[in-house]
Amino acid sequence: GLHLEDYKELARMVESRVDLFNISCGSHERQELFVRTHPSAFLDHGCNVYLAAAIKQVVSKPVSCVGGLGDPEQCEEIIASGQADIVELGRALLADPFLPKKAYAGQKEDITPCLRCFVCLGESVINGTNRCSVNPVIGAELEEKYYVAPPLRKKKVLVVGGGPAGMEAAITAARRGHEVLL
């Protein structure tokens, strides 16, 4: 197999013919390598950034990195430290498509983080649908039918279970004006 030093040499060889190096790793063909392509919650955020940093050391063209990223501060640090020129977000934008806007506005606490749980990837592969465990309206965030309407009568709501579904139910009930106990 090829190693990082091989890819650094390859990057130097093809640099004159590319505009951007998009650095990722792993494989869909072998399960032990798939976890690097789409890092789960069991791996560090940005676990593949070191690869982009290594390629960036040997080329002058822009380098992008990807892999379990979603924390705006970490993304800024990757760019500021020179590890990459571009940070790519995938699943983090499925969880919260407004992440860049919220980060730019300094509203980090309002960002819904990706759990890296693979619901999105699993559903896409199994039946071609878009689903997310923390974004129940994935792909329809701007549709008016999903705006929270005020209740006709304020109620006390008890939500049993603090997992993603329970927390989303509690948030929705609270936004509608109900008194919520989670």
Where are the predicted features?
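Flavin-dependent oxidoreductase catalytic cores
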Residues: 1-160, 164-180
